[in-house]
């Protein structure tokens, strides 16, 4: 009897220390995406130190205030995502988790909308095909914007699933999507600091 209890306790402890497969899949995706962003940022600085002037003549230096505010807003959306993972423990709290994710998604969508507007505005000022600065600048921003858009698709999926009730599978999905947003927010900080480097 004592050995059965010990084995059961050891099994529970092992289960607590392991993560579901979905979590590991997201961790691997994030690792590969971190490599992508690391390569893009390294390319930015490689090109920067090869160029006699950065940005090149005729290209305006990036403005600082709005990108920093927008990044702060994106980072702030991790708070309701985290809170949703914490409250989504019982049936009565699924609704609260749903509203927290919906709040985060609405703010994230607003962030993406403003960023796309700024992206289009920058395209009118200089071209990605004109020089190395334009190429890496627009590539870095476009890749980050694509990650935000993918996150919004994930938000929509989990909102639809949470609307149908909470299961262990959906709870894992919620945690994995929150994990993804933590990464996107962290990368957003790196991207905006790289983008603003000439103006800092």
Residue spans for each PLM region:
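...captures the hydrophobic TM-helix bundle architecture rather than a specific catalytic motif
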Residues: 1-200
């Amino acid at each position: 009897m004592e050995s059965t209890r010990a084995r059961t306790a050891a099994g529970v402890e092992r289960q607590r220390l392991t993560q579901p497969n979905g979590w590991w899949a997201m961790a691997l995706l994030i690792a590969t995406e971190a490599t992508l962003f690391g390569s893009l940022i390294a390319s930015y600085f490689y090109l920067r130190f090869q160029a006699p002037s950065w940005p090149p003549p005729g290209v305006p230096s990036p403005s600082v205030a709005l990108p920093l505010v927008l990044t702060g807003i994106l980072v702030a959306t991790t708070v309701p995502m985290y809170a949703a993972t914490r409250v989504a423990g019982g049936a009565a709290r699924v609704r609260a988790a749903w509203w927290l994710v919906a709040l985060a998604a609405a703010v994230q969508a607003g962030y993406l909308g403003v960023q796309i507007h700024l992206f289009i505005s920058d395209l009118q000022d200089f071209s990605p095909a004109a020089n190395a600065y334009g190429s890496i600048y627009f590539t870095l921003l476009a890749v980050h914007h694509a990650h935000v858009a993918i996150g919004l698709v994930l938000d929509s999926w989990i909102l639809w699933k949470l609307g149908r009730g909470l299961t262990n599978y959906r709870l894992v999905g919620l945690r994995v999507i929150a994990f993804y947003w933590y990464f996107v927010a962290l990368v957003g900080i790196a991207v905006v600091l790289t983008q603003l480097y000439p103006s800092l």
